[in-house]
Amino acid sequence: MENKSVDLSIIILNFNGQQCLEKLLPSLKNHFLSKTSFQVEVVVVDNASTDESVDFLKTFDWIRLIESEHNGGFAYGNNLALKNNRARYVMLLNSDTEFTDEDSNLDRLIEYMDTHETVGIITPKVELTDGQPDRACHRGEPTLWAAFTYFMGLEKTFPKYPLFATYHQSYKNLKEIHPIDACTGAAMLIRSSAIEKVGLLDERFFMYAEDVDWCKRFRESGYQIIYDPEVKIIHHKYKSGMGNSSKTAKSNATYWFYETMQQYYDKHYQNQYPGIFRYLLKLFISFKREK
């Protein structure tokens, strides 16, 4: 990968997210691009937006714009850019994220990857708008047992016990850098040479679960996934990829979360648990999805 001409390619997927981009792009420019010591490019994939996003994006001469003919989902859109990647590392970044002045130094993540060749993915600490952690950036493998303990409230009751808190691995020290099982596609930095080995995102997942699926495939290929709390990105959650009000967007997000959760378990755990356990989980997911 030494012949790559760019150190980092930041891939931003957009669907009707002009208002989000109006906040993200200046923060990215001011708080990272103007300070970094690395060669960085910014690629925005527009997933067939129906708002004025494309016209807005064309006003930025430092952005490489890819226009999709249709909205094929998160994996499909990001893969359009990944297929033409020319950087040593890529970062998937939601359009509803924001960089901060002191904490969003991606150089630290690149430097860590440069000195740790077994790391395939590294994620910053992702905070929600209210300052609370976005727990999706720090996850364990969502086995059926992990899902059961999470949805039954056992993780919340016993957050420091590994047996009951594997879904978000809340028993680990969140103030220190350490390995995790999975992170969120809202902000993840990936080694390009590892993608060549692992493969692209699974486009059968329209939205959600494709990041967890990718992380699982990275781990199965021998790569580590690292969480670094010293780097922070703000996530204004449920604002990207929906094109609706926050309430409607959250409702849509909930539906797709449970829809793709079922896909994930069908893909990876179809024959690994007793039939009755899989049946009960499927009933629960169906109930939550339609609620």
Question: Language model features by range: what are they?
Answer:
Residues 216-291:
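Active-site-adjacent helix/loop segment of glycosyltransferases
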Residues 1-30, 38:
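N-proximal low-complexity "stem/linker" segments adjacent to membrane-targeting elements
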Residues 90, 96:
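Short aromatic/hydrophobic "clamp" motif used to bind/position activated sugar donors
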Residues 141-180:
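Short, flexible, basic/aromatic active-site loop/helix in glycosyltransferases
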Residues 101-136:
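Conserved donor NDP-sugar-binding/catalytic core segment of glycosyltransferases
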Residues 173-200, 204-232:
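A short, conserved alpha-helix in the catalytic core of glycosyltransferases
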Residues 18, 27, 44-54, 70:
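A conserved acidic beta->alpha catalytic loop
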Residues 67-85, 100-102, 108:
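Glycine-rich, basic loop-to-helix element that forms the pyrophosphate-binding segment
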